[in-house]
């Protein structure tokens, strides 16, 4: 199978794993895992970063007067749980070549992160799931996605959105006349304050000349379709 990239970093939101009333939805987990397995079996080298928003959000910490540092680490731990959920689903589907690398040492259930080891294992067909954020507070999973993408030599970051096909000049759910962008530069993201990712992540991607493709994952096989180049999306590159 011919894909538009050979190595990618897939950024998933935690919300992509949940249902209305449950933090995990079996069907959604299996759908994502099946697509990931198909891509890996067809030779794609794949790294994955998952958010933790289905379990923990910073606002919850604010509501109980928790210091941001503590709240950030709780968010990082939520990504560990999501990574383990995705790993177990992938393995249940019969694909055992998957590693979970954590920036926070949790030796019983994850591997300590080392980019050289991750690259070697990815060359052997292993899927790498990166959890625990950067390991430091005040940094988002967007920033972690860009850092890991650079470290594994990814051709691009695939940023999966829920129900939005790419980047608009305003919220399309609130503004029916919102303008959709097919192509943007990293500089335009910052200058126009477009809500794609945080400024730190956008700046890192710009400096590394790392393309970012934003797409809607809510559709049958949309992760595969974006890799095949058959899905409408927004591409951010210099």
From Swiss-Prot:
Subcellular location: Cytoplasm
InterPro entries xrefs: AceGlu_kinase-like_sf, Asp/Glu/Uridylate_kinase, Uridylate_kinase, Uridylate_kinase_bac
Annotated residues for binding of ATP: 11-14, 53, 57, 162, 168, 171
Top EC group: transferase
Record pathway: Pyrimidine metabolism; CTP biosynthesis via de novo pathway; UDP from UMP (UMPK route): step 1/1
Annotated binding of UMP, by residue: 52, 72, 134-141
GO cellular component, one term: cytoplasm
Record has Kinase as a keyword: yes
Catalytic function, reaction form: UMP + ATP = UDP + ADP
Superkingdom of origin: Bacteria
Keywords: ATP-binding, Cytoplasm, Kinase, Nucleotide-binding, Pyrimidine biosynthesis, Transferase
Molecular function per GO: ATP binding; UMP kinase activity
PANTHER family attached to this UniProt entry: URIDYLATE KINASE (PTHR42833), URIDYLATE KINASE PUMPKIN, CHLOROPLASTIC (PTHR42833:SF4)
Subunit and partners: Homohexamer.
HAMAP family assigned: PyrH_B
Function: Catalyzes the reversible phosphorylation of UMP to UDP.
Record protein name field: Uridylate kinase
Gene: pyrH
């Amino acid at each position: 199978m011919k894909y538009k990239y050979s190595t990618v970093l897939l950024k998933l939101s935690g919300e992509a794993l949940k249902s209305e009333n449950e933090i995990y939805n079996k069907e959604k987990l299996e759908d994502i895992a099946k697509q990931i397995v198909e891509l890996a079996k067809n030779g794609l080298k794949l790294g994955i970063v998952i958010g933790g928003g289905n379990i923990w959000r910073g606002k919850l910490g604010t509501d109980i007067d928790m210091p941001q540092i503590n709240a950030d680490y709780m968010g990082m731990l939520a990504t560990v749980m999501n990574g383990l959920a995705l790993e177990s689903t992938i393995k249940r589907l019969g694909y055992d070549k998957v590693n979970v690398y954590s920036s926070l040492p949790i030796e019983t259930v994850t591997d300590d992160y080392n980019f050289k080891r991750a690259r070697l294992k990815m060359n052997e067909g292993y899927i790498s799931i990166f959890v625990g954020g950067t390991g430091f507070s005040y940094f988002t999973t967007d920033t972690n996605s860009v850092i890991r993408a650079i470290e594994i030599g990814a051709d691009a970051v695939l940023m999966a959105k829920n129900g939005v096909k790419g980047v608009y000049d305003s919220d399309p759910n609130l503004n029916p006349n919102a303008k959709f962008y097919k192509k943007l530069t990293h500089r335009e993201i910052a200058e126009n304050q477009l809500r794609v990712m945080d400024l730190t992540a956008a700046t890192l991607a710009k400096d590394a000349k790392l393309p970012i493709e934003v797409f809607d994952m809510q559709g049958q096989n949309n992760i595969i379709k974006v890799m095949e180049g058959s899905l409408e999306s927004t591409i951010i590159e210099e």
